């Protein structure tokens, strides 16, 4: 699509528009594999975003407008300054100590949850495989054992899907886009409540045991984030309790940090990788980071990993590196520098396969979303059953048709690894084979993902044929594509690792025929790293997690090399699967760098001009009317020059006149022409519109609910020049507790206001934010984006050269 098309130009019967950003435009989504391609048709808009053109429909922009931003930016007002000045040293120490205590509790709870997940999955898998083995040994036909295997998988899958239906859609999939969105500054309803966390945990237990090709890492990231949110806020809508005494932590900024700690702890406990958990959250999760957050996150990861290890090993005196998933790989073999070339080639293969996976999976999820739109959840349950049946067939019948191989033909096999008496923990599976033989395909498919990875990473040679590994890789690659996004709790980290290790070992087997010193297990490790880099596009955290999982620091260089090459190769075609899922869910996510097209725009071209301003002293009737008629969550507060020019207004008529002058002009929307910045200065002599602060909707609602009003007689005693004589009927502690509580809707607040109250006034100055971030209307939109993103703003007031309010920038104007 050409970038020269003007807005409104029709191309081939469809209205393709070059986006001219204004206050009504929302974020874009990428529906294509290559830039500029429209895969889905319809009326769409193309804009430049980082590497590619993104496609977004009007419906997408409307859906994104439903999200609200969080208030990460600290509010600087008079009551907060007074609280800070009077705050004792021991109170600061108690708050710091409280944060460390909460981080400890988060780590302990996440570790216990991880232990419950591991043990529950092992028990369910053991029950299933034991019954399959029992019927296989007693029945003359193979279909009875298959029906038992299928029955267990269907039962587990249905329970997992039903739990999502009961606990809500937030319990499905990985939940990582929602966590990333919240940590970026987006309020996502019900993402971290107790009901969602519990539903996702139990759904993950059954989906992970159902034979579906999925992993626990994404759900554990979400579960950990939910635990961090719940334990730090000391309130729950599900359990209907709220401890106001912990108000000091009940703000968006502290909640964000505790969610980061919990999310990182979830990854750390799942993989037994505390450093990897911290780096995963830093690289892939959190948008705001600090040194203090690094310490607390690492501490939470340490506690979570130790707790999980303690329970998994059974309280013995020795500490092992246990996690939900543990692996082993060769430690004696070292690579040669000539092998770096095939390692780079494997990185390219992993990048290509990862990019194809991202593209096809996004297309499948678009189709899935379109197919099930406005339909009963029964259809989603039917899809779960269909995928479970397909996965069961793929896992069972190829194993039935596979050739048996003698155990004696395996070199380097540890004695006792094929114990027929062991059920769910078999490394080599004797399925459909005589004594002394094993089934290579069943070893990969009729077991847990953990056991499959262990045997693929094993240094023992001649375990698998090239045909087995190729068939397994193709089948699981396709199954992962159609399973990711299913209506159950699921992740893709471990499936990608298993697929990559399979074709990596295949390459190692091929090269070992020509070079006797080749160890296929090392190529399995490099293949796993390449595959994950190609689909997830992580770098540092991925390398550290791989090394911590396999305890193979001697292979750090080839792992880094393959990860970097895989990421670079995948980035040529599309972005990571997580970014595409964010776009698919219409989350207005702000990346660290502004889109390229914003460099050519000014703030005036993007700002919303429908701005409602409030005076420093606002009439109750005016404030109530604005809250009832305007959905905005932030209102610029403008100065009353008539008041500031008279230090003592003892004349009540003069005071009323000064107040009414601004209240009567309050509904002026400051409409300006976005294509002509000079028009923004038409009101440069209007002294009634000078910015002096910002008041939030929630703050204004608290003032109305508490009836913190002033009569004209009360206002006469205030010195508007020196700001002395403020009436402060509520302090910072009480005000913060009110903000943390559930604020009733405006129609309920209006019932509390009497006719006499309507003629009263609200002095906003003690409560409004003096440190409001503003920007000139002629500034670059790219600079506005960076300030907005780095500071974590919810609102950015746009002013002209005379400090007059002319517009407002919000998240949706910058996407």
From Swiss-Prot:
Gene that this polypeptide is encoded by: clcB
Entry function: Voltage-gated chloride channel. Chloride channels may have several functions including the regulation of cell volume, membrane potential stabilization and signal transduction.
Listed transmembrane segments: 97-117, 142-162, 201-221, 262-282, 297-317, 340-360, 381-401, 474-494, 506-526
One Gene Ontology MF term: chloride channel activity
Annotated stretches, region: Disordered: 654-685
Entry keyword annotation includes Cell wall biogenesis/degradation: no
Cross-referenced Pfam families: CBS, Voltage_CLC
InterPro entries: CBS_dom (IPR000644), CBS_dom_sf (IPR046342), Cl-channel/antiporter (IPR051280), Cl-channel_core (IPR014743), ClC (IPR001807)
Protein topology in the membrane: Multi-pass membrane protein
Family classification: Belongs to the chloride channel (TC 2.A.49) family.
Main location: membrane
Protein name: Chloride channel protein B
Residues on Cytoplasmic side: 1-96
Organism: Dictyostelium discoideum
Keywords annotated in UniProt: CBS domain, Chloride, Chloride channel, Ion channel, Ion transport, Membrane, Repeat, Transmembrane, Transmembrane helix, Transport, Voltage-gated channel
Domain CBS: from-to ranges: 607-714, 768-815
Tree of life domain: Eukaryota
GO CC annotations on file: chloride channel complex; intracellular membrane-bounded organelle
Compartments, as annotated in UniProt: Membrane
